Curated annotation (Swiss-Prot):
The keyword ATP-binding applies. InterPro entries: aa-tRNA-synt_IIb, aa-tRNA-synth_II, aa-tRNA-synth_II/BPL/LPL, Anticodon-bd, Anticodon-bd_dom_sf, Pro-tRNA-ligase_IIa, Pro-tRNA-synth_IIa_bac-type, Pro-tRNA-Synthase_IIa_type1. It comes from Geobacillus sp. (strain WCH70). Keywords: Aminoacyl-tRNA synthetase, ATP-binding, Cytoplasm, Ligase, Nucleotide-binding, Protein biosynthesis. Coiled coil: none annotated. It comes from the Bacteria. This is Proline--tRNA ligase. CDD domains: ProRS-INS, ProRS_anticodon_short, ProRS_core_prok. The keyword Transcription regulation does not apply.
Length: 567
């Protein structure tokens, strides 16, 4: 492609509203433009990268035995009502009515559509297992779209869905998809981790997220420093054991703590460590109140609370709800003298607290000399806290470290979550009706483009891996007015194309400095510069990733480029 005939609107200045590196560079290098908040146009360079990423995904999906189709973005409310998600999904679901007042949604996912399709078309075990996938636009009404393509309101996803007659069959496909995803992200050149995760609004049980390591990641990954263990911080179990001290039990005493609200303030005021304090948090778990107790230096994990009660919705109680249930303010909560209508559960670490401190359910007062079981009853002890750096790894190997990650893929074992709700059944070998078992597997395709840009960039611009770069070679004629340079560049533009390379040829009548700056900004892996030694048949090659440059004869050009791209 000749750059003079293309559409690559580069920018010299960083756009004011672009917060992160990938967003800044994709805008500046002419890959994307914002159409509305969280909505983007892929310009020609961006479209080429998108197509490269999609091609890798298709190859790996097809290799894993998945079959491509295309489902509608506009989905009838009836299907979402059958699954129950029409009522539970929340404000992120974009809803609309047609001219006949019928309800529709712009799909954030396609579980309902695919389940209805397979339910209506597959009637016998002989047609299973079946895995179908699509690459399609999705919609989510994000409260605050940010970071460019990383969190938009319209985005492109690859979503696959598998249907099975047995758990063993699902396990086999899940493992194939897990391996396919690993191959996809490896081929994109990414530094990533597959982590144990929570299924969220999709539902289901076993699930892994594929996280690209990045300082701007919205998720925290807990990983072992001595093994391959990695999990989303919400899901990492705590295996720490706690020794209970043998100090004599003191009597329970209520003390005045004026103006002391936080654990740090109370601990300092009473001259104890946070480990001696019991932190009390009131959650609304579906339709009941639960008081969750954790040690003062720990944080309560709402996902673990949700899983403990197998709940649909878990939220911190509002100040008004706290007043209603506990008759006190949030900063004074404690487990002593609580109404029987409130369930009390505690993290394992609380069991080891001796002569501790807790709120007295009265403004400006706390209890000291607090001992669980003696002073209040706990319904159940469980792992209810977030794992922390320095905790032992759940696999027993090494200790936990934290990293930030951008989620680019997610695989789920859905089980019968959707098939049962939507009556997706088949006839087994004995002619009996059975419910299909499902899995689903998603990749954020447009988000993946941004994640690659986030990992592969330097102070001068983007540095695309060869596998997803918009072009293999950026050919630059230093002086377009010089006949020898222009002729040699024209000749090798044709020859490189014939040799199978994708070439962007900068034939613009611009200064050399502008061309080189744009080349670095765009980030094509190999730059070939035709300059002063054109009359000798000598050109300069520069590797974008390493900055390495060399002069070579044009006779060696094709072999040299091929070798460099394979490194």
């Amino acid at each position: 492609m000749r750059q003079s005939q293309s559409f690559i609107p580069t920018l010299r200045e960083v756009p004011a509203d672009a917060e992160v590196k990938s967003h800044q560079l994709l805008l500046r290098a002419g890959f994307i433009r914002q159409s509305a908040s969280g909505v983007y146009t892929f310009l020609p360079l961006g479209q080429r990268v998108l197509q490269k990423v999609e091609a890798i995904i298709r190859e790996e999906m097809n290799r894993a035995g998945a079959i491509e189709l295309l489902m509608p973005a506009l989905q009838p409310a009836e299907l979402w009502q059958q699954s129950g998600r029409w009522y539970s999904y929340g404000p992120e679901l974009m809803r609309l009515k047609d001219r006949h007042e019928r309800d529709f949604a712009l799909g954030p996912t396609h579980e309902e559509i695919i389940t209805a399709l397979v339910r209506d078309e597959v009637k016998t075990y002989k047609r299973l297992p079946l895995t179908l996938y699509q690459i399609q636009v999705k919609f989510r009404d994000e409260k605050r779209p940010r970071f460019g393509l990383l969190r938009g309101r319209e985005f492109i996803m690859k979503d696959a869905y598998s249907f099975h007659t047995s758990q063993e069959s699902l396990d086999e496909t899940y493992n194939k998809m897990y391996e396919a995803y690993s191959n996809i992200f490896r081929r994109c050149g990414l530094n990533f981790r597959a982590v144990i995760a929570d299924s969220g609004a999709i539902g289901g049980k076993d699930t892994h997220e594929f996280m690209v390591l990045s300082e701007i990641g919205e998720d925290t990954i807990a990983y072992s420093d001595a093994s391959d263990y990695a999990a989303n911080i919400e899901m990492a179990p705590v295996i720490t054991t706690y020794e209970k001290s043998d100090e004599p039990l003191r009597k329970l005493e209520k003390v005045h703590t004026p103006g002391q609200k936080t654990i740090e303030e109370v601990a300092s005021y009473l001259q104890v460590t946070p480990e001696k304090c019991i932190k009390s948090l009131l959650f609304k778990v579906d339709d009941r109140y639960v008081l969750v107790l954790v040690r003062g230096d720990h944080e309560a994990n709402d996902v673990k609370v949700k899983n403990l009660f197998d709940a649909s919705v878990v939220e911190l109680a509002t100040p008004e709800e706290t007043k209603q249930a506990m008759n006190c303010e949030v900063g004074s909560l404690g487990p002593i003298g609580v109404s029987e209508s409130v369930t009390i559960v505690a993290d394992h670490a609380v069991k080891a607290i001796v002569n501790g401190v807790c709120g007295a359910n009265e403004e400006g007062y706390h209890y000291i000399g607090v001992n669980p079981e003696r002073d209040f009853t706990i319904s159940e002890y469980a792992d209810l806290r977030f794992i922390q750096e320095g905790d032992p790894s759940p696999d027993g190997k090494g200790t936990i470290r934290f990293a930030r990650g951008i989620e680019v893929g997610h695989v789920f074992k859905l089980g019968t979550r959707y098939s049962k709700a939507m009556n997706a059944t088949y006839l087994d070998e004995n002619g009996r009706s059975q419910t299909m078992i499902m899995g689903c597997y998603g990749i954020g395709v447009s988000r993946l483009v941004a994640a690659i840009a986030e990992q592969f960039a330097d102070e001068n611009g983007l540095v695309w891996p060869a596998s997803v770069a918009p072009f293999h070679v950026h050919l630059i004629s230093v002086n377009a007015k010089n006949e020898e340079q222009r002729q040699l560049a024209d000749e090798w533009y044709e020859k490189l194309g014939q040799a199978g390379f994708e070439v962007l040829y900068d034939d613009r009548p611009e200064r050399a400095g502008v061309k080189f700056a744009d080349s670095d900004l765009i980030g094509i892996p190999i730059r070939v510069t035709v300059g002063k030694r054109a009359n000798e048949g000598i050109v300069e090659i520069k590797v974008r990733q390493t900055g390495e440059s060399m002069e070579v004869s044009v006779d060696e050009l094709i072999d040299t480029i091929r070798r460099l791209l394979q490194q």
